[in-house]
Structures are given as C-alpha cells and as structure tokens.
Amino acid sequence: MTNLEELWVGKNKITSLQGIAPLTKLRVLSIQSNRLTKLEGLETLTALEELYLSHNGIKKLENLEHNTQLTTLDFCANQVTTIEHVRHLSRLSQFWANDNLIADLNHLDAHLGPQYMPHLDTVYLEGNPGQKSEGANYRRKVQLALPQIAQLDATLVRRS
C-alpha cells in the first residue's frame, strides 16, 4: 500500500485523515463528500499534486505547508471563511473555492497573485458571500487581482 499513487475515498463518512501518513507516494487524494472538519495529517504527503476536499465541513485552509507540489486544490462546498495559508503553493494551477463562506475578496492578490502563483490558470469563487456582495463588479475585481488566470468559474477570461 505504501506505493499507492492515487486514493479516491469519496462518500465514506470519513471524519479524519488518521493513518494516511505512510502513503508518501500519493499524487492524487480525493476525499470528497465526507465529514472532515479540519485539514490535518497531510504532512508526509509531499508528492501530492491533486487534493480534492469538496463537500466536507472544513472551516479553515491550513496544514498544507509540506504539500508544495500541489497543482490542484479543490475545497468547494465547505465552510472556509478566508483564503489564507496557500501562498507557498507556487505550482498551483487550479484553485476551486466556490460555495464556501468567503466574504472578503479584497486581498486575493496577497494570497493567489502572480508573484506567488504564476501557473494559476483556473479559479472558482462563485457562490461565496463575497461574489454576491460584489455583484456586477465581481468578475472585473477578480481579474484585476489575478491577471494570470484564464478561467474564472465556468467562463474564460477575456484578455484586454
């Protein structure tokens, strides 16, 4: 099992990532639609490239310091309130954060800007309170903060 490269355990009522530490060769981890409330136990998974955490009860993005190979981070439909602790994920190309509780979109560049994430291509933020409160300004605001992206939510970004 220690040579396992992909683990897909969706819809299993998982409440913690206990026991996953020996799987150091994991590249893809999908734990969607479970009962996680906290991100922990990923420290030894330094080869991880794709992490799918959607539809859990995660409240905070944290404990990803050792997962610097991540190219995809999906934490849609959780209870995350702020985008933080991701600046070091410089290889990230896909950042899916839609349908959370993120109210403030004013500092996206401080966490996801091109100086930190030059490969960031796709960002999903729709369905957050911040998107709703920005109204018609939402798309433009995100594009100005993240000029490197080619897709915002399900729509391609026009380059001016």
Describe the role of every protein-language-model region.
Residues 52, 85, 95, 101, ...:
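Alpha-helical recognition domains of nuclear gene-regulatory proteins
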Residues 14-15, 36-37, 58-59, 80-81, ...:
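Extracellular beta-strand scaffolds
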Residues 19, 32, 41, 54, ...:
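Residue-level detector of alpha-helical recognition elements and their boundaries
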Residues 1, 17-24, 40-46, 61-68, ...:
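A structural signal for leucine-rich repeat
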Residues 4-9, 26-31, 48-53, 71-75, ...:
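Conserved hydrophobic beta-strand positions in leucine-rich repeat
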Residues 68-82:
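Short, charge-rich amphipathic segments
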Residues 122, 127-160:
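Membrane-proximal C-terminal cap and juxtamembrane stalk of leucine-rich repeat ectodomains
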